[in-house]
Amino acid sequence: MKSSSSQSYDVFPNFRGEDVRHSLVSHLRKELDRKFINTFNDNRIERSRKITPELLLAIENSRISLVVFSKNYASSTWCLDELVKIQECYEKLDQMVIPIFYKVDPSHVRKQTGEFGMVFGETCKGRTENEKRKWMRALAEVAHLAGEDLRNWRSEAEMLENIAKDVSNKLFPPSNNFSDFVGIEAHIEALISMLRFDSKKARMIGICGPSETGKTTIGRALYSRLKSDFHHRAFVAYKRKIRSDYDQKLYWEEQFLSEILCQKDIKIEECGAVEQRLKHTKVLIVLDDVDDIELLKTLVGRIRWFGSESKIVVITQKRELLKAHNIAHVYEVGFPSEELAHQMFCRYAFGKNSPPHGFNELADEAAKIAGNRPKALKYVGSSFRRLDKEQWVKMLSEFRSNGNKLKISYDELDGKGQDYVACLTNGSNSQVKAEWIHLALGVSILLNIRSDGTTILKHLSYNRSMAQQAKIWWYENLERVCKKYNICGIDSSTDGGGSTYGQCSNSQFQRNMDASPGGNKTSNQSTKDSPRASQVEKEKIEYCEPHVYITPAIFSDGTRAPKYVESSSRRVTQVHHAKTWWPENCEKVYENHNNIYGIDRSIDGGDKFEGKSKVSDGGLDGKDQGSMYGQSSNSELQINMDADNRRCEPVSEMLFKNYNVCSPNGLTDVNCSNPQSQRKLDASLKKDKIVHEWIRTGSGFFFDFQGPKSIVSAAQVDEKNFEYCEQGVYITLGILSGGIIVLKHLEFSRRMAQQAKVWWSENWIKVYQEHNICGIDKSFDGRFDDRRVIRQLRPN
């Protein structure tokens, strides 16, 4: 017959069938099955006088052997031969063996005395001395191992439950992935005490604390520690996906019941199934990152929904949510102390709680860079792992830079927090004080208060749907925030690109956002006091050190002019009574003010303009105009954004609309967020004679563009056009013939870069077809080392 032992087993049971098959062993199998332990079953094996190779293989392929010694165990040569094999695997293969003494004295088994010895003596009659020696040795050694004696338990059921738990812990020990989280044992012990395992009553508790204190890590470690005690268990991190409240609740219940009952695709017709199905069931439930009271009401509405001894843990940042759900027992998680933070850093950096000799000062400085936030400690500590002293010094120098500090801060954010990034850097001569304002709907805004008292507020959103929620909040609350914090500018861009980039969603309150060092202007001031756009001095439009952010604004009289949202503390540009941003009619601005030469639409405001610092009527001063920095991502608004309109031929409006061309004067304006790389890119494009001729004449296939046939093949795209950009900024460039298309994408963390990769893997063909993009970089930090990725993504 075909062997059933071709697979591995968790447990091999060795027992005398006549004594315990339909009693103890049957109940033991049930307990093991409840814990998803794969147990060998010999029911289909034909018994014979000699043990079969099939059984020998099953013993070898099992991780644990359970030997049940009963009154008539020794009457079976089959059992004794299996025991010899088990003892051999214990010695040679380090297999785990657990003896169970069922209504028999362990000393009688070890010494083959008493009633057990009498039965064994009968079995040995007619056997060779070699067989008897093997059996006696196996009985003595296995019976000496730590096991369970029924006489020590109040009931058989309690003993079997404990055996199943012990086996589960040996097979699936709690994860040690949390060992680097110094102090986690204290958290777990406190939570176990709060859950009251000494009580038969079901209990629900909460874990609460600020973001990035390790609440989820603590919750997962607790779940890992307790899960072996619960057949029905679930670690839940659901979020709202469906607009309809009722449909969303049905979806949550179906997912929850499928997971906790281990049944695929459970379907329910109406809400309330959780209470109906689990009210007599002992469960372990951990709800992570809860921010929706409806989730609690749907899945754990009442403690009476669950059976006795059930344990439910709710993890959230919102204490008011726990209060609203009447969760009285709350465990507060704070940031680790300086001592614990230092130990945590050392665990990640050195694999132990303290630094080795010669690294004390270096470790102290590195730990201070990370602060007391667990994720930052993990990121920084892991960065120094296995580095020598010289490499430590070099790495510390890198971490002192603003870029790495920003990256650490960003990596500290949780999944939702990383959808909203708020960052700003002022001039090095300014004393900056930063504080987080936690706004409605989970939006985080960073206020930078300069030494002169004025405030810059920057809001960056990468999720368009969440940005819409942010807009609603700003519409209702912006005036109050601006007045309270003396805000002089705001950027409400959504995702670093698209037609809405740079538009303010709070036009009603924009007039209150033009704070000057002298104070804020009010919205009630007459428009007659407002300067006309023509009165704006040209010298206001100039390079003002790094971190300058220019944006166009519409005055109260309808005229328009550029406006600095941010400038250095030494040059504060004053433009009063801007009411809204320019969502339409931008051509009028450039017709009236041809000194406007571009807009910085970068994410962090850290790009500086190339070329000379001032703008004249004839364009940029000097011969080397450099790159047209800050090109618009909205093709329709970019048509007239050239410094020298008189020398630029009219551009086909169709091409701008359909292909999002970055500037009207052609291919030299491919824009990169790194000035040094931009110059290289411009220079390489200018060397192309065909491109140069096209720029000079303003004619050719550019204006006669009919379709993909006019585009150079992907193979002709010079890979040197894919430039490296600093500080971990994620850039994707798709360059057509000479550079017509520029696709720019900014990412600040590997997690978000991975998300971008997933999106591109699913949609890049469609994007290529629509925009004729010839190449794209999928790397995390803009280092285009993997040319295979670029080649792979080129269209056929």
From Swiss-Prot:
The keyword Flavoprotein does not apply. It comes from the Eukaryota. Residues 502-528 have a biased composition (Polar residues). GO terms for biological process: defense response to fungus; regulation of defense response by callose deposition; signal transduction. Keywords: ATP-binding, Hydrolase, NAD, Nucleotide-binding, Plant defense, Repeat. Its EC number is 3.2.2.6. Residues 607-624 have a biased composition (Basic and acidic residues). One of its GO terms (cellular component) is cytosol. The active site is at 82. Residues 185-413 form the NB-ARC domain. Pfam families: BRX, NB-ARC, TIR. It catalyses: NAD(+) + H2O = ADP-D-ribose + nicotinamide + H(+). Residues 502-537, 607-636 are annotated as: Disordered. Residues 434-486, 538-594, 719-772 form the BRX domain. It is an enzyme of class 3 (hydrolase). Residues 7-171 form the TIR domain. GO terms for molecular function: ADP binding; ATP binding; mRNA binding; NAD+ nucleosidase activity, cyclic ADP-ribose generating. TIR-NB-LRR receptor-like protein that confers resistance to the pathogens Leptosphaeria maculans (blackleg disease), Botrytis cinerea, Alternaria brassicicola and Alternaria brassicae. Required for efficient callose deposition downstream of RLM1 during infection with L.maculans. The TIR domain mediates NAD(+) hydrolase (NADase) activity. Self-association of TIR domains is required for NADase activity. This is Disease resistance protein RLM3. The gene is RLM3.
